[in-house]
């Protein structure tokens, strides 16, 4: 039996869990852990420049790989700096384990130096949290934490470690549990067969069905089963922001993204559907608009592993609790064994209507403009990378342009903060992706507002030689804020302009990277090709692109309207 100190147990537990990377920042309460990390081998630590970035890097790592991201921060400000990243992961169901230092057990509650109640602060935004009270409990708690983070609906876990239990002079028996079970937590993995049969009966008789998929399809690795079901039944598919790439964007049945800035055909199809098969979605406000007007004629079948997500905002007529991949396999097996193609309703008229909506060309824009259009930037970079890059974004117009105009044809290639909408996410997340997948092309598409939130991580990129391509869509403003002010507040621009932007090229160069500026549409493709060439040579390349500051993201749903009520262009509204 091994006798280890608490700090050694932390590192040994991570090694036994198979962890390869930790994203963190040292401080007094965790120096014993950092000393153990120095002396033990098997884990690489990535030193960030801010703890928020540590959580975003771990988040990007987790989204791109499906593995659990690990964060290590000190007590007090180190812990509180990680909160935004934890909330980001929680909203999007991303598995993280965040290890936070804490003051000594005897000092908790006495306002000691760098003390904060990390358990209390993080409680609403974690799947579970642990305050470790005994050194010998460390292996068992770590095993539980990693199982909880990845099982059922994934999410972040916090482990708070008081400094005294890490004491390198006190040795305790180290026992790594082979198995773990928590009696109060047992996710349902298989769908109820009766509910599945009922759902399938309704689905194959539908005249205007649609499959609506969310991030749960990505998390559960269900994209192959989804594609097979959609093709077997010839049903159109629409996606939330989080599900891009689960079904190839160029698939003929993919109506692309729905919701606030979704395509005309996606929003019209779901509004007019008579049956909605929703898989791994939350029905959040960005995808429903006014819930009282939501899809008035639809029977809703909702599949989700989290029973609390079902009927939370939109009531499901047929709820099915289970792991999406398992449930889809159950549906496919039932379809194969009990139904023939002659029983499936002919959807010719439905597809004719959908193709009519598609003819609106809701994503068309001015391609002859003398100013650079952000849509054109995304289309060109998508073509140059064959839609195969891993793409991170921040939040705002650039995020929506990327979602609408980049052709994501594989799952896990789109990495963004969907639920919380976190500015400053894109750069550190891209570094996490690149660390996990060093041979892949990684893009960070951002804006002049968002990039400044965590721009210090250009230093981290240089230290670890992480070569990514940053496309800064620079409109000298907070673009989405300005768009809302244009449309809703009669053009009253209150604090949405950036009047003192840095020289991004010189800033990137000061960190040791390559900077490229683009001002003219005719230079766009040529300079983006150059940027990709420099990227392939192992450089981080920062491309500052001056875009049309007046460009808006369309379509845009009308507030408090139905899914079918949209602004298609500046001069065109529709509720037809």
Swiss-Prot record:
InterPro entries: Acetolactate_synth_lsu (IPR012846), AHAS_TPP (IPR039368), DHS-like_NAD/FAD-binding_dom (IPR029035), THDP-binding (IPR029061), Thiamin_PyroP_enz_cen_dom (IPR012000), Thiamin_PyroP_enz_TPP-bd_dom (IPR012001), TPP-bd_CS (IPR000399), TPP_enz (IPR045229). Its cofactor is Mg(2+); thiamine diphosphate. GO terms for biological process: isoleucine biosynthetic process; L-valine biosynthetic process. Pathway: Amino-acid biosynthesis; L-isoleucine biosynthesis; L-isoleucine from 2-oxobutanoate: step 1/4; Amino-acid biosynthesis; L-valine biosynthesis; L-valine from pyruvate: step 1/4. Residues 397-477 are annotated as: Thiamine pyrophosphate binding. FAD binds at residues 153, 261-282, 304-323. It comes from the Bacteria. Keywords: Amino-acid biosynthesis, Branched-chain amino acid biosynthesis, FAD, Flavoprotein, Magnesium, Metal-binding, Thiamine pyrophosphate, Transferase. One of its GO terms (cellular component) is acetolactate synthase complex. One of its GO terms (molecular function) is acetolactate synthase activity. The keyword Cell division does not apply. Thiamine diphosphate binds at residue 51. Its EC number is 2.2.1.6. It catalyses: 2 pyruvate + H(+) = (2S)-2-acetolactate + CO2. Binds 1 Mg(2+) ion per subunit. Mg(2+) binds at residues 448, 475. Dimer of large and small chains. Contains 1 molecule of FAD per monomer. The role of this cofactor is not clear considering that the reaction does not involve redox chemistry. Belongs to the TPP enzyme family. This is Acetolactate synthase large subunit. It comes from Buchnera aphidicola subsp. Baizongia pistaciae (strain Bp). The gene is ilvI.
């Amino acid at each position: 039996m091994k006798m280890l100190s608490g700090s050694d147990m932390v590192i040994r537990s991570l090694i036994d869990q198979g962890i390869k990377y930790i994203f963190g920042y040292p401080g007094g309460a965790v120096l014993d852990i950092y000393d153990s990390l120095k002396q033990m081998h098997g884990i690489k630590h990535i030193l960030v420049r801010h703890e928020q970035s540590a959580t975003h890097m771990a988040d990007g790592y987790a989204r791109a790989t499906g593995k659990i991201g690990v964060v290590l921060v000190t007590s007090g400000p180190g812990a509180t700096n990680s909160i935004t990243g934890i909330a980001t992961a929680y909203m999007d169901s991303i598995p993280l384990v965040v290890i936070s230092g804490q003051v000594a057990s005897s000092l908790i509650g006495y306002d000691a130096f760098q003390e904060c109640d990390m358990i209390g602060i993080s409680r609403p935004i974690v799947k579970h949290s642990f305050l470790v009270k005994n050194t010998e409990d460390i292996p068992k708690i770590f095993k539980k934490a990693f199982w909880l983070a990845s099982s059922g609906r994934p999410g972040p876990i916090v482990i708070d470690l008081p400094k005294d239990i890490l004491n390198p002079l006190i040795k305790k028996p180290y026992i790594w549990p082979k198995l773990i079970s928590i009696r109060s937590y047992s996710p349902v993995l298989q769908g109820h067969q009766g509910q599945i049969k009922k759902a399938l009966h309704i689905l194959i008789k539908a005249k205007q069905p649609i499959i609506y998929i969310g991030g749960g399809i990505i998390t559960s690795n269900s994209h192959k089963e989804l594609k097979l079901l959609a093709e077997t039944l010839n049903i159109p598919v629409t996606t939330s922001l989080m599900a891009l790439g689960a079904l190839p964007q160029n698939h003929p049945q993919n109506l692309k993204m729905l919701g606030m800035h979704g395509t005309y055909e996606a929003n019209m199809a779901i509004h007019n559907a008579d049956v909605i098969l929703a898989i791994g979605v939350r029905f959040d406000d960005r995808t429903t608009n006014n819930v009282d007007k939501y899809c008035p004629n639809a029977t809703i079948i909702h599949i989700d592993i989290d029973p609390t997500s079902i009927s939370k905002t939109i009531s499901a007529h047929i709820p099915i609790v289970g792991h999406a991949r398992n449930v889809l396999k159950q549906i496919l097996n039932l379809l194969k064994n009990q139904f023939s193609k002659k029983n499936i309703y002919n959807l010719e008229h439905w597809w004719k209507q959908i193709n009519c909506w598609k003819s609106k060309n809701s994503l068309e824009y001015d391609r002859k403009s003398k100013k650079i259009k952000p849509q054109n930037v995304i289309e060109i970079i998508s073509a140059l990378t064959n839609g195969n890059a891993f793409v991170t974004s921040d939040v705002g117009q650039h995020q929506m342009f990327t979602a609408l105009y980049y052709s994501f044809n594989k799952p896990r290639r789109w990495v963004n903060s969907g639920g919380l909408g976190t500015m400053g996410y894109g750069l550190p997340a891209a570094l996490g992706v690149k660390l996990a997948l060093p041979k892949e092309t990684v893009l960070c598409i951002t804006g002049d507002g968002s990039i400044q939130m965590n721009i210090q991580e250009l230093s981290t990129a240089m230290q670890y030689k992480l070569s990514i391509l940053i496309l800064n869509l620079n409109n000298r403003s907070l673009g989405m804020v300005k768009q809302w002010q244009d449309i809703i507040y009669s053009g009253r621009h209150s604090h949405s302009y950036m009047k003192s932007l840095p020289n991004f090229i010189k800033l990137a160069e000061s960190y040791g990277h390559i900077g490229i500026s683009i001002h003219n549409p005719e230079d766009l493709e040529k300079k983006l090709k150059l940027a990709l060439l420099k990227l392939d040579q192992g450089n981080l390349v920062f491309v500052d692109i001056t875009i049309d500051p007046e460009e808006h993201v369309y379509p845009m749903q009308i507030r408090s309207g139905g899914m079918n009520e949209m602004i298609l262009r500046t001069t065109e509204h529709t509720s037809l």
